[in-house]
Regions:
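Short, basic, helix/turn surface patches
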Residues: 126-138, 172-178, 233-253
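Catalytic subdomain that performs nucleotidyl-dependent activation
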Residues: 73, 150-235
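ATP-dependent adenylation/nucleotidyltransferase module used to activate substrates
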Residues: 2-158, 162-166, 170, 174, ...
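Long, contiguous hydrophobic alpha-helical segments, chiefly transmembrane helices and signal peptides
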Residues: 27, 187, 251-254
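The feature marks non-catalytic terminal segments
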Residues: 204-297
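Electropositive phosphate-/nucleotide-binding environments in soluble metabolic enzymes
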Residues: 17, 21, 84, 125, ...
Length: 297
């Protein structure tokens, strides 16, 4: 008679077995496609206590166990001012799932609570800075964040609708303020629905968002709140009812931009106008596929 698996073993096995197609394979695809991990890397996996960062930690552990490519992992938790019960939940989940976390404190919530305009943006920027600094202190050259496929889509649509910009979320980027540091997003191709399914399958409870602005959403567990991002999330859910592939289409779109069809674009902060490009001898070579499609419509 085989012994009963521990919660940690069940969670790990389900990533490789039950959710291999929807979680493990897309995770590996992103790591390979975007060259996120290199031999000799020392990566700080940043854990907020939510489902996304925790599943990222488990996936990175599994990858480290099953790859011949040597790299090191550090599991880092920044406490920006959590309530004691929220911090305890993070610690309990780390113990339950076998994640050896390092916790450090900051006063980010105290700073941002008094900010009326864009507190979430300020909080995110401050968090990023603290995480880079601590990771560098721990000898890491990369930080890994839990942004997933759905975040990429929502960010793109939100920027277009509310920011007046067609801008995506890159799978990795170099830090401007911390030389030698990079940020990677290994969940780039993993859908949020799959992460929620894994969480429910393993009967796990995570922080929804422990921010003081959004604590009322903790018990819901559906990822829906009151921010502009949540408005976009709900809009996409509605659109998926009539077009199930809408997120896939958006993702393919940002992976295959045809710049010669745009009236202008920015590259490394420099704006390039349509006349500038139109008159460039190597840029325009005639009608584009999008023009043909437009004429058909």
């Amino acid at each position: 008679m085989s012994r009963e698996l521990t919660p940690q073993e069940t969670a790990e096995r389900s990533l490789i077995k039950t959710y291999r197609k929807s979680i493990w394979n897309p995770f590996i695809a992103a790591v390979k496609r975007y060259e996120l991990i290199e031999p000799g890397d020392r990566i700080a996996v940043c854990i907020s206590g939510g489902k996304d960062s925790v599943i990222l930690a488990k996936l990175m552990q599994e990858l480290q166990r099953h790859t011949s490519q040597p790299f090191e992992l550090v599991f880092m938790v920044m406490d920006p001012g959590y309530k004691p019960e929220n911090r305890k939940l993070i610690e309990d989940n780390a113990t339950l799932l076998g994640i050896p976390i390092t916790i450090f404190d900051s006063d980010i919530f105290d700073v941002t609570i008094s900010v009326e305009k864009n507190p979430c943006y300020l909080c995110a920027r401050m968090r990023r800075g603290f995480l880079y600094a601590k990771a560098q202190e721990l000898g890491c050259n990369k930080i890994a964040l839990g942004h997933h496929f759905s975040d990429v889509i929502e960010t793109t649509v939100m920027g277009l609708f509310y920011g007046g910009q067609l801008q995506a979320m890159p799978p990795k980027l170099r830090s401007k303020n911390f030389p030698g540091m990079e940020l990677i997003r290994p969940l780039y191709c993993v859908h949020e629905d799959a992460i929620i399914a894994w969480k429910n399958y393993n009967h796990l409870q995570f922080l929804q968002c422990a921010c003081r602005f959004t604590e009322e959403r903790e018990a819901a567990g559906d990822g829906v709140g009151r921010s502009k991002r949540q408005e976009i999330k709900m809009l996409l859910r509605e659109l998926k009812k009539t077009n199930p592939n809408i997120e896939k289409s958006i993702f393919q779109g940002i992976n295959g931009l045809q710049l010669d069809t745009f009236p202008g674009f920015k590259h490394r902060g420099v704006f390039h106008s349509f006349p500038e490009l139109y008159n460039h001898p190597d840029w325009f070579a005639g009608e584009t596929k999008s023009e043909e499609i437009s004429e058909e419509l």
